[in-house]
Amino acid sequence: MPNNATLVVAGDFRTDEAKRYISEYFGSIPKGADIARNYPKEDPITESKEVNWGDPNIQLPAYLFSYRVPGQSERDSYVLSMISNYLSGGKSSVLYKKLVDDEKKALQVQAVNLGLENYGVFAFFAIPMGSTSKDVLQKDIDAEVKKLQTTLISDEDFQKLQNVAENNFVNSNSSVEGIASSLATYHVLYGNANLINKEIDIYRSITKEEIRDVAKKYLNPNQRVIINYVPEKK
């Protein structure tokens, strides 16, 4: 339906000609009914919850520690994206180096900020190595989060995060297709297509103190849901 769609034209074109083609190809499509967007409001998570999910098709367990965080248009969501990069963005990141490379406690570990329109999810995902227990992985992940909450990251690590943010932004907008995709995303999910000109400045303005404070605000044990995804006998 036209009233639930976004059309982006990017590249070298004449505006009057583009409008004529848009009208020619899409103008006859009728408008649909009005769309009600009444999203439920969720109560804050104030105590830890744990659930088990068995799957007969897997051989190794996986553990998910997830937290509800702000929607992707909020400034704190940008900070959480930098936190996820610091903790697990690449083989030199804190959690990968500690749990996978050095201590061989995990086959895989990730920290992901999944930005969504209203609320987001920040989640740690870990697959244990050998007999490593969930409690051990949870303790080690919590310890790294605690460091973030109480100690400012180094200038070197902070500069790396800034470099990653700039590199990701440039790469995603280095082609006409990428620019069109970004414009659509910013308009539909953020309500502001002009973020294509301003989002990088948001990342550049984030401070080490904000990283500490946002970790302290959202990544606490009483604010999470733990999912144990475990093998189940057939």
Predicted regions and their residues:
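Non-catalytic beta-strand/loop surface segments
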Residues: 1-3, 28-74, 85-136, 157, ...
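Non-catalytic, conformational "gating/processing" segments within enzyme and secreted inhibitor domains
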Residues: 1-25, 223
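A common structural junction motif
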Residues: 25-33, 103, 142-153
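Zinc-dependent metallopeptidase catalytic helix centered on the HExxH motif
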Residues: 77-78
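Short amphipathic alpha-helical coiled-coil/interface segments
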Residues: 141, 162-169
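Acidic/histidine-rich, surface-exposed loop or edge segments in extracytoplasmic proteins
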Residues: 192-197
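Gram-negative outer-membrane assembly/targeting C-terminal domains
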Residues: 217, 221-224, 229-234
